[in-house]
């Protein structure tokens, strides 16, 4: 708590000070640790006002995660798309695309699902679970869009492994 108070005091005294981004970043980490979603949203929101800051990727991830968990999928989708576009590592890009995929599924946005799943399936290092999830949701989106042949291709790949939930279906 003393660190939190110190950073908060600093921001009250110097809202645009040289270390304000650092303070917002550390306050968002403290908020995450203490499960203070409102605090995390507040401080990551401030960080996102500076898209070129060294904290923007992590801020997008934390911000998007909370919005997703609060079922605010449209807003979370925007964060995940930004993360996908700006990520400096393959791992973070994959987290962004996975977020886009899951938001797309929950928003019933077939085009978003197809694009995200296709992007995920193009990733070099994809876990079998994530590959199956992407194939499954893309197949369902293709069916919704009446692209039966494309859906069948994805479903055939999934059916090879009936040990998984997706393959069994």
Task: Show the residue positions of the predicted features.
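Acidic, polar-rich low-complexity tracts and alpha-helical solenoid repeat scaffolds
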Residues: 1-169
């Amino acid at each position: 708590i003393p660190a939190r108070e110190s950073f908060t005091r600093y921001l009250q005294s110097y809202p645009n000070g040289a270390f304000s981004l650092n303070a917002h970043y550390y306050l968002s980490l403290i908020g995450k640790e203490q499960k203070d979603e409102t605090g995390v949203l507040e401080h990551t929101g401030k960080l996102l006002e500076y898209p070129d800051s060294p904290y923007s990727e992590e801020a997008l991830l934390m911000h998007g995660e909370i919005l997703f968990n609060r079922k605010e999928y449209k807003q979370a989708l925007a964060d995940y798309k930004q993360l996908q576009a700006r990520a400096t590592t393959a791992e973070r890009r994959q987290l962004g695309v996975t977020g886009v995929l899951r938001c797309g599924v929950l928003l019933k946005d077939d085009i978003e699902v197809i694009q995200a799943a296709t992007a995920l399936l193009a990733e070099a290092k994809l876990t079998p679970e994530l590959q199956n999830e992407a194939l499954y949701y893309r197949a369902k989106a293709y069916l919704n869009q009446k692209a039966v042949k494309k859906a069948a291709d994805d479903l055939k790949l999934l059916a090879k492994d009936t040990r998984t939930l997706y393959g069994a279906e």
